[in-house]
């Protein structure tokens, strides 16, 4: 059978289910897929987590390296988030340098961590203006079945929350790192993102891949532990009317607390 015809049939099935008040996988419109988190899965990383969100699966590793502070923040450490989307995870992903999807994914996670002030960057300064810890958060997608944003945020904050920082001291202008002598990374918050797909006038929490293919637009809302919205990212070309935007943000704020409880219970 023609692949385009198969795609049209599947699109019709997904849309028909939504219009009937259902979803293709049987969930309610406001329901997340099952969330599984396993922390500490990479022995050589300073922190790590494996996340399953339905059939979406990814692993996040945190690695700390000694670097130089930025000139405009000489008393702070640095944060760098990277995402790797490989063909093994989804045929639509291409090998090579990060594409626009990987870059957007990295930026959404980075912004959520920064704007929530999850990490106390000042605690990562070793010597003001000279040496600091650079925190690398690397996201590796293993299986893509939709909503990489929320899965990546869950994995990143989970990995950071168990990260251990080696003690370091400066001797004769050189940084000596004591790998076996560590302390927990200073954490101030536990941000959670909630992604909502808009299909017509319908709002779907945690869209699976089949729903992402037909959605008009997407909103990813990152929420702090206190319930404050700290970051919002809109995706795709469709519009988001004001009344639906308000509904989406309210819904995201409510769901973020549920997801946070689920994740923390597994750490």
Curated annotation (Swiss-Prot):
GO terms for cellular component: cytoplasmic exosome (RNase complex). InterPro entries: ExoRNase_PH_dom1, ExoRNase_PH_dom2, ExoRNase_PH_dom2_sf, Exosome_comp_Rrp42_subfam, PNPase/RNase_PH_dom_sf, Ribosomal_Su5_D2-typ_SF, Rrp42_archaea. The keyword Cytoplasm applies. One of its GO terms (molecular function) is mRNA 3'-UTR AU-rich region binding. It comes from the Archaea. Keywords: Cytoplasm, Exosome. Transmembrane segments: none annotated. It is found in: Cytoplasm. The keyword Cytoplasm applies. GO terms for biological process: rRNA catabolic process. Non-catalytic component of the exosome, which is a complex involved in RNA degradation. Contributes to the structuring of the Rrp41 active site. PANTHER family: EXOSOME COMPLEX COMPONENT RRP42 (PTHR11097:SF8), EXOSOME COMPLEX EXONUCLEASE RIBOSOMAL RNA PROCESSING PROTEIN (PTHR11097). Belongs to the RNase PH family. Rrp42 subfamily. Component of the archaeal exosome complex. Forms a hexameric ring-like arrangement composed of 3 Rrp41-Rrp42 heterodimers. The hexameric ring associates with a trimer of Rrp4 and/or Csl4 subunits. This is Exosome complex component Rrp42.
């Amino acid at each position: 059978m023609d692949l385009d015809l198969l795609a049209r049939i599947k699109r019709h099935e997904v849309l028909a289910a939504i219009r009937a008040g259902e979803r293709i996988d049987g969930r309610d419109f406001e329901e997340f897929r099952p969330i599984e988190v396993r922390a500490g899965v990479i022995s050589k990383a300073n922190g790590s987590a494996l996340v399953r969100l339905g059939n979406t699966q990814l692993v996040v590793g945190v690695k700390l390296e000694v670097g130089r502070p930025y000139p405009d923040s000489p008393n702070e450490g640095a944060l760098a988030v990277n995402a790797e989307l490989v063909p093994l995870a989804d045929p639509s992903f291409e090998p090579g340098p990060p594409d626009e999807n990987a870059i957007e994914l990295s930026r959404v996670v980075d912004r959520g961590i920064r704007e929530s002030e999850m990490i106390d960057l000042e605690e990562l300064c070793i010597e003001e203006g000279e040496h600091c810890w650079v925190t690398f958060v690397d996201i590796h997608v293993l299986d893509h079945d939709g909503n990489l944003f929320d899965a990546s945020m869950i994995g990143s904050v989970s990995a950071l929350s168990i990260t251990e920082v080696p003690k370091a001291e400066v001797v004769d202008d050189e940084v000596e790192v004591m790998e076996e002598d560590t302390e927990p990374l200073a954490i101030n918050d536990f941000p959670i993102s909630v992604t909502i797909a808009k299909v017509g006038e319908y709002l779907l929490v945690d869209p699976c891949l089949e729903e992402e293919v037909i959605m008009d637009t997407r909103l990813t809302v990152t929420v702090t532990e206190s319930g404050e919205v700290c970051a919002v990212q809109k995706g795709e070309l469709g519009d988001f009317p004001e009344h639906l935007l308000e509904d989406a943000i309210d819904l995201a704020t409510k769901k973020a607390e549920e997801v946070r409880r689920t994740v923390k219970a597994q750490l």
